[in-house]
């Protein structure tokens, strides 16, 4: 079970159910300052989309629309890290890689990418919140989280997935 979830690995064969929760407080900067809150980050853009193609054979169109919406709303900043959905499914990981390459204008322009699903599994409804918390912690600590269980590269998933070892980096803008 420890090696069952293998995001972006050539030998991935499906997601592993996880269990977890993440919580974030979203409030105005002024309110956070007024109550003396420790501010971990700022939400500068978001996107949402549905992929109505088919539940088990999605395309990259839905995720790409969401990514483009968030990126445009944020003012198209230099992104230092992407915490990918990275479900360990052959179709999703390939489509997500293609969408990231399109968003950033090619493989050579993509920031480092990782998926935490090798560590925690797919926490379904909690996945987005957990991934946002991981982005904030990565920014706070200056550490790119690894994609664990990555051992065999896939020609369709050819980005820098931060394989197996965390990496120090300055992270100003992260995308999840």
Which residues make up each language-model segment?
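Glycine-centered flexible beta-alpha turn that most often forms the glycine-rich phosphate-binding loop
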Residues: 85
């Amino acid at each position: 079970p420890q090696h069952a979830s293998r995001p972006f690995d050539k030998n991935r064969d499906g997601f592993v159910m996880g269990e977890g929760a993440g919580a974030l407080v979203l409030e105005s900067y002024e309110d956070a300052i007024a109550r003396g809150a420790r501010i971990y980050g700022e939400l500068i853009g978001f996107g949402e989309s549905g992929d109505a193609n088919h539940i088990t054979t999605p395309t990259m169109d839905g995720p790409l629309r969401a990514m483009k919406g968030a990126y445009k709303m944020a003012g198209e900043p230099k992104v230092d890290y992407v915490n990918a959905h990275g479900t360990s499914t052959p179709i999703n990981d390939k489509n997500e890689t293609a969408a990231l390459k399109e968003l950033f204008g090619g493989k050579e322009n993509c920031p480092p990418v990782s998926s935490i699903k090798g560590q925690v599994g797919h926490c379904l409804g909690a996945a987005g919140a957990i991934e946002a918390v991981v982005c904030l912690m990565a920014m706070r600590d200056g550490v790119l989280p690894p994609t664990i269980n990555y051992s065999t590269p896939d020609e369709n998933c050819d980005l820098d997935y931060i394989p197996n070892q965390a990496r120090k980096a300055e992270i100003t803008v992260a995308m999840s």
